[in-house]
C-alpha cells in the first residue's frame, strides 16, 4: 500500500512538473539574442548627406538602400530595426527622395538619428 501511494505521488509530481514547465514568471531568465535588421546608420553617417547630392554620392556614403520605391518615384529607404533581448523594439527610417535627374531633394529621418 505504501509503495502504491509512493508511486502515485511520484506520478502526480511528474505530471505537475510537465504541465507547469512552460509557465514561468521569470521571462528575463531566458536568453534572447539581440536582433538587428536593415541598414545600420550612425548619426555621423546621417549628418554626411545633404540636399543636392547625387544618387551615386549617397550610395557611396551610406551604402545601398534597403528598399527603393518600385513605382517610379526616386525614393530610397534606409530602415534599421533593432530588438535588443527583452527590451522594446526600435526602428529608424531614413527616407531620401531624388528628382528625375538623380539629385537629392528631400530627407526625412524618423525618428531622428541623434548622438547619445
Curated annotation (Swiss-Prot):
Signal peptide: 1-22
Protein name: Outer membrane protein assembly factor BamE
Superkingdom per UniProt: Bacteria
This protein's record includes keyword Plastid: no
Pfam family, one: BamE
InterPro entries in UniProt: BamE (IPR026592), BamE-like (IPR037873), BamE_dom (IPR007450)
Compartments, record wording: Cell outer membrane
GO biological process, alphabetically ordered: Gram-negative-bacterium-type cell outer membrane assembly; protein insertion into membrane
Keyword Lipoprotein found: yes
Amino acid at each position: 500500500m505504501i509503495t502504491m501511494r509512493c508511486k502515485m505521488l511520484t506520478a502526480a509530481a511528474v505530471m505537475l512538473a510537465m504541465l507547469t514547465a512552460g509557465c514561468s514568471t521569470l521571462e528575463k531568465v531566458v536568453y534572447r539574442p539581440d536582433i538587428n535588421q536593415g541598414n545600420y546608420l550612425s548619426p555621423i553617417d546621417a549628418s554626411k548627406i545633404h540636399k543636392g547630392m547625387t544618387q551615386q554620392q549617397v550610395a557611396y556614403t551610406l551604402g545601398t538602400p534597403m528598399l527603393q520605391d518600385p513605382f517610379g518615384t526616386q525614393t530610397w529607404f534606409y530602415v534599421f530595426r533593432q530588438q535588443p533581448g527583452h527590451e522594446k523594439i526600435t526602428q529608424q527610417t531614413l527616407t531620401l527622395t531624388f528628382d528625375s535627374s538623380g539629385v537629392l531633394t528631400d530627407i526625412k529621418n524618423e525618428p531622428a538619428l541623434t548622438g547619445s
